[in-house]
Regions:
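Active-site and donor-binding regions of nucleotide-sugar-utilizing enzymes
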Residues: 1-107, 126, 130-132, 143-145, ...
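Short acidic alpha-helix that forms the nucleotide-activated donor recognition element
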Residues: 8-13, 184-191, 200-210, 231
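Structural alpha-helical scaffold elements that stabilize or flank donor/cofactor-binding regions
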Residues: 10-12, 65, 118, 205, ...
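Short hydrophobic/aromatic-enriched beta-strand-loop microsegments
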Residues: 41-45, 90-96, 150-155, 175-178, ...
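Catalytic binding pocket for nucleotide-activated donors in carbohydrate/polymer assembly enzymes
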Residues: 69, 202, 207-289, 304
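Active-site donor-binding acidic/aromatic loop of nucleotide-activated sugar
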Residues: 96, 177-180, 188-198
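Conserved catalytic-core segment of nucleotide-activated headgroup transferases in glycan assembly
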Residues: 104, 108-182
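C-terminal alpha-helical cap of glycosyltransferases
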Residues: 294-309
């Protein structure tokens, strides 16, 4: 928690020489105590938007917090242009988003998942970090689209508690949970819809996808990580709420990602990707190229911190 006592206790225990905060982390008491003790602090992979409190007439306290950073490293020129007028002595530089390097590392060290090969023949559609609104739409489309009869669905819900898995399962006919299937796979029919009821598999599952769908686009907070799928050269689909995510907008503009608005547009998009192999490959290739083009943020970030610490 961000409190004077918590900050003091943490400083005494860790005794940091430098502190790096990530993206949206603004911990006032930690920043203040670091400034008093002349400990360099950096905000990395930061993103700023006009609707944030820093740019409101009542955001003076939050604007003053920005002055406590030794340096702020932003993802893009839009963030830099927004924040530059608010800074005095704080160093400011565009370094990009370190998540691009992270997903490239995941792809380079990918691990095989044995049970995927046991699925029925056909293309696999992986849906990652999905919510109830996603399940309603995906469930409707999977039951209607003729082209999807030859596909396997791997559904990876954002929440894997019993109630959430039960709710997810209710949207799909004859869906099977992974834990259930693995214990009875010798006697149970191979699933068309497999619901992953455990954590830690999603980033590795995308390598097996013909198409990836990213959840969260129908929630207030927006979509989850599109880069984990894009790095494997997969066409990536998501819902309408992506305006807070520069990487998603960039992926769309690079023709590696497709935004859908409802069940009808998802149906049409899936049919196009499944029927038109040239289009599907071009979309996947564009997704990978987009990720590769944005590599290097980690090195830039480390160099900036080293030079300004």
């Amino acid at each position: 928690f961000d409190s004077p006592s918590a900050a003091t206790q943490w400083m005494e225990m860790v005794q940091p020489k430098c502190i790096v905060f990530i993206k949206y982390e603004f911990w006032y008491y930690y920043l203040k105590l670091a400034a008093v003790n002349k400990i360099p602090t950096f905000l990395a992979s930061a993103v700023f938007r006009p609707d944030q409190i820093f740019f409101k007439f009542y955001g003076g306290f939050y604007r003053s917090m920005l002055q406590l950073f030794t340096g702020i490293l932003v993802q893009d020129i839009h963030s830099k242009n927004l924040i530059a007028p608010l800074l005095k002595d704080t160093h400011l530089q565009i370094t990009g988003d370190t998540r691009f390097d992270r997903v490239l590392d995941i792809a380079a060290t990918k691990k095989s998942i044995d049970w995927v090969s046991k699925l029925a023949e056909g293309k696999i559609i992986v849906t990652g970090s999905t919510w109830e609104d996603d399940h309603q739409i995906i469930g409707s489309v999977s039951a209607q689209c003729d082209q999807l009869e030859q596909c396997n669905w791997i559904i990876v819900p954002h929440h894997v508690d019993a109630a959430s898995i039960k709710a997810c399962r209710s949207h799909f006919t004859n869906a099977i949970c992974l834990s259930e299937w693995l214990t009875q796979s010798n006697t149970m029919e191979k699933p068309v819809v497999l619901i992953i009821d455990q954590i830690g598999l999603l980033s590795q599952l995308y390598q097996y996808a013909a198409i990836a769908y990213i959840g969260g686009g129908f929630t207030k907070d927006g979509i989850h990580n599109v880069l984990e799928a894009a790095v494997f050269g997969k066409p990536v689909i998501w819902g309408p709420n992506d305006l807070k995510y520069p990487e998603a907008i960039g992926l769309r503009n690079a023709y590696g990602g497709i935004q859908i608005m409802d069940a009808s547009s998802l149906n049409k998009t899936l049919e196009k990707l499944l029927n038109e192999t040239t289009f599907s490959k071009a979309t996947g290739d564009a997704a990978l190229k987009f990720v590769q083009a944005h590599a290097g943020a980690t090195q830039k970030t480390m160099e900036f911190i080293y030079e300004n610490r």
